[in-house]
């Protein structure tokens, strides 16, 4: 029995020497003993509240508590009232190190007590080191080094390092870090506070860092980041995302192999309100003759740097009333130099105006793998992932990128007119400059914003090659397209996407538009010769858009209304001027039976008008069915005018035009031949009769006149042949013969259409006569559908006075006042000239 008691005593002594002991989990008993003057405090407290129904307590001598504090020189034995205390409690072990009253314990830092002797709770080891301002402290981290994370981020293994510094009595957060990074050392002065957070299941039993003594660093801190190969690091200013301490200095030292290149890009930053000094970043770059190089935070940062370099952030004296905050988050990317980095490209924009060129990364899915960055460098030094070049200068750029297909270009140019008297009839070419085409980066968009004075001028686009409108039935298969849309902020109007190789000869638009050349394949470089638009400023017209279409006899033309996916905007009118060659017939086909539009206010109309005869059909789109396929022998208009539709019932129409050769009916030819033969025989018979009568007259002797003075020599009056008076009939009114009936062959245009000039009606000039679209009915009217209604031309001249014997005018439906028609045949008068 004595031997047994001796063994128990030895075992208990061993537990005390270790400082803490844990009994088997079944007993759930723990003992923690802290040596005297160790400056260690252990605190067990409730962690994040859980939804567990049954609470858990710390049990000491049958007392149930929720928090336990153990100080130096104390020994406590305790248990938990539950089987899973890690779900309820956390443990903090804090060691205070005072370097101001005695020597500092420099070297590797140990975990005390050992994690193997502590309860299986989430653990936080804290080292709080206080030192003089003149003493620098350096935290050295063993491999794997640290990686800084931002707010809301977490470490994959749950192990985090929280590091803080001190400015007088104020604690400053340097940052939160995970394992597997590039941060190897952090230097501070006036003290440091290091917290290591370990999850309850993690087996780690070493701190992973050491403390060294250094001279004063004369700044808040210095963070060293070491790159052994290609990689990237994201770093943040102190207190991020809150404000950087006022008038402080923080430095990052980067160790980069000489054969690699480093580039810096700012991901996020804010500036405070400075009273004195200026917030800035300073670089110490190897080989630079101007070290340190000073940049503003909004400047493009250096890139393509070889070897080690330093980056410092300098604050300022802030405004006491409105200080604002200074903060910075940036990324350093290290990679091998690329061949393109040694090649300089010249982009000459000195002759351009109101133009900007942006080179930027394509949108890609994020990957956890390291991907070498793509940078574009200005003058080989200022590098960033985005670079914007402006007009008026000549620029030299190079690329630091392993794959240039990861970049693309977007260009914007504004062509505006402020004085309509100067701009009218002026033309501008919309072409991509050759300097841009020669760059090794693919062009994505080239946008021209075309601006005109409101209600003064309109625009016309004429392509180098006729355009095809992109539709689902006939998509564009070229390497680029033109996207035409309104440039008025309050107007949602997209005319469509167009590519070369179609039948659209020109596009007229009423007001400001944006024309965007968008490429879809690298082959655009080979097809660049096909691109080219000419824009001209023309007199103002009220149509939102007019498309001039000259269909090809070999293919079907598909056309659709603007805003196909959203519907034609309210109260918008668009027209298509469709030319039909003389020897062709056009078939107009709509692809659905009804338009589907439901008008909230007003009416939606479609007008199909023959340009030669002015015959037109008017359809109410919100009531009528769309017309069935119709054939047109001459050029014609299609006009579509929208109402204010209800939500979800928008107006969108798709139609096609197909040309076929014109054929003549054999029956018509036979009838014409027979009729011609009859007329010829009748003419021959009439000629024979006239010849015979003439011969009879020549056989008679000369006539002898005898004077008789009892005979009245006055010519007798013409007896009345009309029972009505002059006022009762239109005998004095002659119908005017239309010019097109007499001079029709002189009024035909190149496409065979008749151009009928308008008379006695003033309209603003809208181009060549006959190119004006039909005017839609009043939007709020309820006019029924009119079929083939020939337009009556207005009178050609003012009405004549009633005293004139003859009047040339159009038929008048009004009453004609009665006048005497008895006029002596030998006393006739010449008609008077019409009054001007």
From Swiss-Prot:
GO cellular component, as recorded: extracellular region; plasma membrane
Domain called CUB: residue spans: 417-544
Region (Disordered): 776-836
Position of the signal peptide: 1-29
Protein name in the entry: CUB domain-containing protein 1
Tissue: Highly expressed in mitotic cells with low expression during interphase. Detected at highest levels in skeletal muscle and colon with lower levels in kidney, small intestine, placenta and lung. Up-regulated in a number of human tumor cell lines, as well as in colorectal cancer, breast carcinoma and lung cancer. Also expressed in cells with phenotypes reminiscent of mesenchymal stem cells and neural stem cells.
Quaternary assembly: Interacts with CDH2/N-cadherin, CDH3/P-cadherin, SDC1/syndecan-1, SDC4/syndecan-4 and the serine protease ST14/MT-SP1. Also interacts with SRC and PRKCG/protein kinase C gamma.
Modification after translation (UniProt): Phosphorylated on tyrosine by kinases of the SRC family such as SRC and YES as well as by the protein kinase C gamma/PRKCG. Dephosphorylated by phosphotyrosine phosphatases. Also phosphorylated by suramin, a heparin analog. Tyrosine phosphorylated in response to dissociation of integrin alpha-6 beta-4 from laminin-5. N-glycosylated.
UniProt site positions, description: Cleavage: 368-369
TM segment ranges: 668-688
Cytoplasmic side: 689-836
Domain of life, source organism: Eukaryota
Membrane topology, Extracellular segments: 30-667
Annotated glycosylation sites: 39, 122, 180, 205, 270, 310, 386
Disulfide bond positions: 476-499
The keyword Acyltransferase appears for this protein: no
Modified residues (Phosphotyrosine): 734
Result when mutating residue 762 to F: Impaired association with protein kinase PRKCG but not with SRC
Protein role: May be involved in cell adhesion and cell matrix association. May play a role in the regulation of anchorage versus migration or proliferation versus differentiation via its phosphorylation. May be a novel marker for leukemia diagnosis and for immature hematopoietic stem cell subsets. Belongs to the tetraspanin web involved in tumor progression and metastasis.
Keywords: Cell membrane, Disulfide bond, Glycoprotein, Membrane, Phosphoprotein, Secreted, Signal, Transmembrane, Transmembrane helix
